[in-house]
A protein has these predicted regions:
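Conserved "landmark" site that anchors the functional core of diverse proteins
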Residues: 1-366
Length: 366
């Protein structure tokens, strides 16, 4: 395995949880929940970068609770997660659009902070003012909260994240960060090689580090959605730069790649998205290709002619020609594509030019 070849020493997944350590106790772990950050730099050891599939959303979650951007977060694929707060915890949920609720004695807690819907710092105890922004009570002990905002969970509160209505992955950041060990400089779980912490399971207690400053310092305000989330029934536009092996394909093959709508198949995960289309991408060069480096966002075309988009857990090398590479912002969007989603590719032109361009959709980079 990769971990054997580089002799990686796996540290314990997280710091121990004492009675006085704030934590999140996992009641339901969902389809796949992992620790992620910005990933590791270890390609020279044959190890992929890994990290958050939607880095924009993970950075936003950390910003909302006042953490550095690279602080480990929880990446939740497909929702269905429930976690109980042990002690007071400031959290933020970003990413895929989903119903997020808090169950606990919220009405009496909210009354301490007034009724103007604002987060009140510097109240007695440091963070004991208004606990929820833009919340609505739909039951005596259940509160529905808007995403993309800091929220205070009190001891015993249960945070629930439902399956997404658009997008695929949600991110949970906690003020101070999770007390998770790093491997090769990162706390990211690499699902292909097994490097990093194991996927989160029910009954785990996830320790939370103490924030270095007062809990209200640097906590952000509610933010708009950072990316255009994939929506059912509407094709998602992904922007690419052609190459380095686009010359291995026929003109008809390039046209098929760029003009038809592709569907994300169920054989997709954090490693990559397998696509299906009516017209396969035809190759003009049928030789075997020596293994080459494959970055996240590379789009390989195997002999079937059905493209594969590599995501964050991609292999460091691949043996099929790469027809194009996603732009960084499109890589984050691709990380939110669920099975069944439809995508279209658009070529990015680096500069405006009078030279005739291919008759494909383009986006000019300024």
């Amino acid at each position: 395995s990769v971990s054997d070849s580089v002799q990686v020493s796996q540290a314990p997944d997280s710091m121990s949880v004492s009675a006085s350590t704030p934590a999140l106790e996992v009641l339901r772990s969902g389809l796949l929940t992992t620790f992620q950050d910005d990933g590791r730099v270890a390609a020279n050891m044959g190890v992929t970068g890994s990290g958050a599939a939607d880095r924009t959303s993970s950075h936003l979650a950390n910003a909302l609770v006042g953490n550095p951007a690279n602080t480990p977060v929880l990446e939740i694929t497909g929702g269905g997660v429930r976690m109980r707060a042990i002690g007071s915890v400031v959290v933020a949920v970003t990413g895929a659009s989903a119903d997020v609720t808090i169950t606990g004695s919220r009405q009496s807690q909210d009354s301490q902070g007034g009724s103007n819907g604002t987060f009140t710092p510097n109240s007695p105890g440091g963070c004991s003012g208004r606990t929820v922004l833009n919340a609505s009570n739909d039951a005596a002990d259940r509160t529905t909260i808007a995403m993309q905002q800091p929220v205070l969970l009190r001891d015993g509160d249960v945070l629930s994240i439902a399956p997404p209505t658009s997008g695929l992955r949600d991110y949970v950041a906690v003020r101070g960060g999770f007390g998770v060990a790093t491997t090769l400089g990162s706390a990211a779980t690499d699902t292909m090689s097994g490097i990093g912490p194991r996927p989160i399971a029910a009954k785990q207690r996830l320790a939370i580090r103490t924030a270095s400053t007062a809990c209200d310092a640097g906590v952000g305000l509610p933010q708009p959605w950072p990316t255009d989330l994939p929506k059912p029934g509407r094709p998602t536009d992904l922007y690419v730069r052609l190459g380095p092996r686009d010359d291995w394909f026929t003109a008809a093959g390039l046209s098929a790649f760029l003009t038809q709508t592709w569907t994300v198949t169920a054989q997709s995960n954090r490693v990559g998205l397998r696509l299906s289309g009516a017209a396969p991408v035809e190759r003009t060069d049928t030789r075997e290709l020596a293994s080459e480096a494959t970055p996240s966002g590379a789009i390989e075309v195997p002999t079937s002619g059905q493209p594969v988009i590599f995501l964050r857990d991609q292999p460091v090398t691949g043996g099929y020609p790469v027809i194009a590479v996603l732009e960084p912002e499109s890589l984050d969007v691709a990380g939110q594509l669920p099975p069944g989603a439809c995508v279209r590719f658009h070529v990015v032109s680096a500069h405006a030019t009078s030279t005739p361009q291919p008759a494909y959709p383009t986006k000019e980079v300024r």
